């Protein structure tokens, strides 16, 4: 049965606090927070805009209490220091760190090209030259970070983003590894990452070299890019681990002989005999068409590293999160947010049309009222076996049954994009991606009386002006500029 965690949406809204933005938006320092881009048990990533200069960023919001509870202060300071010093063109940049009394905010580079994951499906493998280009950028970025003592430990296509020019950007470098510890033997001992991409020595949990484990994951990614499917796959976790331990996989016939040879040397189950990053970089297959990265020099300040745990109130990095409670209406998307979700202005849409992708989020538009949309979603999801929690115009749908990758969890939010038009964004926050799309298809079928257009229908209308959202964005820009 659907349950709600906050008062009814008819509750009168409070007056907007001084310094907060209108329409229920949250303001943190000089940044106005927008929609949620991704979330996990440890943090949420929000789209944000610098109100002083208009720059767009992504802000990772971490619960300070969890950091303190897990005695991770020294570790998080070390990770932040390293991340701020990393200035590689293929790694997401960290610009600054802020903190409130309850949260830590990482201000990160925002890229608009989508995930590399979105370019891959069972029928959408990349050509070898294109796969090699991304692999070269990946190896360069990971090797650079290793040279500065930072290991990823959860490399997978979902953590590899693309900028507007199609260049690779590795995300969550170092930060994804915060809960892990190095013991006295100098080896990592925490099993982490996505099982299909994890090295056998990590699964063994006997201690492992972070660089060798990351290289294994890079090898799996290369295989996926070229094959369109995973080298190690099994619905039974024990059977999957056995395949990984023995490196039981077969390269498809379209792999070149030199690519097969390199992948087999990377996916060596014995870390002692596995090829190294230095050897990969000197490999003839790898060097074909290689372009060295171009670095930018910039001054870096580490003053904010200690300041984020300074609660004296004297630190300039201590910010106050201001927001409006009890919204009467959904948040209204501004012009840039419309553009950033627009199919016509997002490079990822070009790949979607060609690849038949499996994405972790989707959306539809509706001309029904916001309250009716929320009520109908609650009514449609409950019979499908989902617990529904509603907080104003944000919803969390959690499956009662456990699927292939645990319980399916779907974060949903209703945005107003025009006086009588709303956009409903649904994002997988837990569970299996394919199960998410099956759920979404069944849900929207049950919502056909309120769904105006789905994302697929928008694409069918073409990318000129970005379809519904692109046209809406253009009209919004024109209105704001007058």
UniProtKB/Swiss-Prot annotation:
Which residue stretches belong to region PPI? 359-388
Q: Name one GO cellular component term.
A: nucleus
Phosphothreonine is found on 190
Name the phenotypic consequences of knocking out this gene.
Answer: Plants exhibit an increased drought tolerance and an enhanced sensitivity to abscisic acid (ABA) during the stomatal regulation.
Q: Which GO terms describe its molecular function?
A: ATP binding; potassium channel activity; protein serine kinase activity; protein serine/threonine kinase activity
Q: In which tissues is it expressed?
A: In seedlings, mostly in vascular bundles, and in roots, especially in cortex and endodermis cells. In adult plants, mostly expressed in flowers, and, to a lower extent, in roots, leaves, stems and siliques, particularly in vascular tissues. Also detected in guard cells and root hairs.
Q: Which residues carry this modification: Phosphoserine?
A: 176
Subunit notes for this chain? Answer: Part of a K(+)-channel calcium-sensing kinase/phosphatase complex composed by a calcium sensor CBL (CBL1, CBL2, CBL3 or CBL9), a kinase CIPK (CIPK6, CIPK16 or CIPK23), a phosphatase PP2C (AIP1) and a K(+)-channel (AKT1). Interacts with AKT1, CBL1, CBL2, CBL3, CBL5, CBL8, CBL9 and NRT1.1.
Source taxon at top rank: Eukaryota
Q: How does it sit in the membrane?
A: Peripheral membrane protein
- Family to which the UniProt record says this protein belongs: Belongs to the protein kinase superfamily. CAMK Ser/Thr protein kinase family. SNF1 subfamily.
Q: What class of enzyme is it?
A: transferase
What this protein is reported to do is described as: CIPK serine-threonine protein kinases interact with CBL proteins. Binding of a CBL protein to the regulatory NAF domain of CIPK protein leads to activation of the kinase in a calcium-dependent manner. Downstream of CBL1, CBL2, CBL3 and CBL9, regulates by phosphorylation the K(+) conductance and uptake of AKT1 in low K(+) condition, in response to calcium signaling and during the stomatal opening regulation by monitoring the turgor pressure in guard cells.
Query: Where are the annotated segments for Disordered?
Result: 1-29, 459-482
Give me the residues that bind ATP, please.
Answer: 37-45, 60
Tell what the record comments on domains.
Answer: The activation loop within the kinase domain is the target of phosphorylation/activation by upstream protein kinases. The PPI motif mediates the interaction with the ABI (abscisic acid-insensitive) phosphatases.
Keywords from the UniProt entry:
ATP-binding, Cell membrane, Ion channel, Ion transport, Kinase, Manganese, Membrane, Nucleotide-binding, Phosphoprotein, Potassium, Potassium channel, Potassium transport, Serine/threonine-protein kinase, Transferase, Transport
Q: Where in the cell is it found?
A: Cell membrane
What is the recorded post-translational modification? Autophosphorylated.
Taxonomy of the source species: Eukaryota, Viridiplantae, Streptophyta, Embryophyta, Tracheophyta
Q: Where is the composition biased (Low complexity)?
A: 1-25
The protein's name: CBL-interacting serine/threonine-protein kinase 23
What reaction does this catalyse? L-seryl-[protein] + ATP = O-phospho-L-seryl-[protein] + ADP + H(+); L-threonyl-[protein] + ATP = O-phospho-L-threonyl-[protein] + ADP + H(+)
């Amino acid at each position: 049965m659907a349950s709600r965690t906050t008062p009814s949406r008819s509750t009168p809204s409070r007056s907007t606090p001084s310094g907060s933005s209108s329409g229920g938006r949250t303001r943190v320092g000089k940044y106005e927070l927008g929609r949620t881009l991704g979330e996990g048990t440890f943090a949420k990533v929000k789209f944000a805009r610098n109100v002083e200069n208009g720059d767009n960023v992504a802000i990772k919001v971490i619960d300070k209490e969890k950091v303190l509870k897990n005695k991770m202060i020294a570790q998080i300071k070390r990770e932040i220091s390293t991340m701020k010093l990393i200035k590689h063109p293929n790694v997401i940049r960290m610009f600054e760190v802020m903190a409130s009394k309850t949260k830590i905010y990482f201000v990160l580079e925002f890229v608009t090209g989508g995930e590399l994951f979105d370019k891959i499906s069972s029928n959408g493998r990349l050509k070898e030259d294109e796969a090699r280009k991304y692999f070269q950028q990946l190896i360069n970025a990971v090797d650079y970070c290793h040279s500065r003592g930072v290991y990823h430990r959860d490399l997978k296509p979902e953590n590899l983003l693309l900028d507007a020019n199609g260049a690779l950007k590795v995300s969550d470098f170092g930060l994804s590894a915060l809960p892990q510890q190095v013991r006295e033997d100098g080896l990592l001992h925490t099993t982490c990452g996505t099982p299909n991409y994890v090295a056998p020595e990590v699964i063994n949990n006997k201690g492992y070299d972070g660089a060798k484990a990351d290289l294994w994951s890079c090898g799996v990614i290369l295989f996926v890019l070229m094959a369109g499917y995973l080298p190690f796959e099994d619905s039974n976790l024990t059977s999957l681990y056995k395949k990984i331990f023995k490196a039981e996989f077969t390269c498809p016939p379209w792999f070149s002989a030199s690519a097969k040879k390199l992948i087999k040397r990377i996916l060596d189950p014995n870390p002692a005999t596995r090829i190294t990053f230095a050897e990969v970089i000197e490999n003839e297959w790898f060097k074909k068409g290689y372009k060295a990265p171009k670095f930018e020099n910039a001054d870096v300040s580490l003053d904010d590293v200690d300041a984020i745990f300074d609660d004296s109130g004297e630190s300039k990095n201590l910010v106050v999160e201001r927001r409006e409670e009890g919204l009467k209406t959904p948040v209204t998307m501004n012009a840039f947010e419309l553009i950033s979700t627009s199919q016509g202005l997002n490079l990822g849409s070009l790949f979607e049309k060609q690849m038949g992708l499996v994405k972790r989020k989707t959306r539809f538009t509706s001309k029904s009222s916001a309250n009716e949309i929320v009520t109908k979603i609650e009514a449609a999801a409950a019979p499908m076996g989902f617990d529904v929690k509603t907080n104003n115009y944000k919803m969390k749908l959690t499956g009662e049954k456990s699927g292939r990758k645990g319980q399916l969890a779907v974060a949903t939010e209703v945005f107003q994009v025009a006086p009588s038009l709303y956009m409903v964004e649904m994002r997988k926050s837990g569970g299996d991606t394919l199960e998410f799309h099956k759920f979404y298809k069944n849900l929207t079928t049950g919502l056909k009386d309120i769904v105006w257009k789905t994302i697929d229908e928008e694409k069918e209308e073409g990318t000129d002006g970005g379809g519904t959202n692109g046209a809406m964005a253009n009209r919004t820009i024109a209105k704001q500029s007058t």
